[in-house]
Amino acid sequence: MTQRVNFAQQSPQLFKKFLAFTNELIGSTIEASLIDLVSIRISQLNGCDFCLDMHVKQAAIHGESELRLNEISAWQDSNLFTTRERAALTWSEILTKLPDQGVSDDVYDRVREQLSEKELSDLSFLIASVNGWDRINVGFKTASGRLTRQST
């Protein structure tokens, strides 16, 4: 598959700023392991092979188990994820899919039981970032398997 547009080359300033925004999230209230889980799930939902490959590699670098990585797509039926992780995955899925009726108070309340307002805010920015990268990479057919860089 040939990449349609090298967006980093064509829009270098926007690319750098979007990357800086994404990197800023690494120091947020959301721990690296949760960032990895959420990023993987969002990229699964969006069908972004490039991003999924990158996030899985990053999670492995951070010590995530192969068993849990294999269970992320079925997290709702798995007993391998904590209540906090389930809340974050719920919020990630709902903001990625954006149902016509919006986010129910029930879902919000269940998520808020596990995440502070600051954590939920940081998580929401993370979700927006991953969705943005997914859409760019899917649209321009960025090939997966190219990233081998170690964690920064």
PLM features: residue spans?
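Hydrophobic alpha-helical segments
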Residues: 1-152
